[in-house]
């Protein structure tokens, strides 16, 4: 059985999590076991209990990574956090391999493979895994919401999911 680990993001201000409880259910339905680090989704306001209800096991960073075949991340985890992963395990995250070369080299030295999700082809078949489009879309949406709040007046003819203002 493949073990998938979801670690808490270490970067300051990073509130996203690499897998939601819905995603965990899908992985388990495919025959994988999923371990989630305690508090991994606190910044995203998803309680640990939701992961347990989805079938994941919760634990410390070390217990979560121990014997993992795949480690999911929003950003690449610190190589020191990968103690105990299987030799040849996969790190699947946004890795910034050109800007974080030392981290990529540390993954190789630790015997793990790295899949930089930002290099996923931007084609229809891979659209559900395209992190650049989805995250850019969310960033743009949030920027408009923030701008509207700072503007102080209503935006005329603004079209939203709730209707047109």
What are these regions (language model features)?
Residues 2-106, 110:
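An N-terminal-biased, well-structured beta-alpha scaffold segment characteristic
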Residues 2-3, 9, 79-165:
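Glycine/serine-rich phosphate-binding loop and adjoining beta1-alpha1 elements at the start
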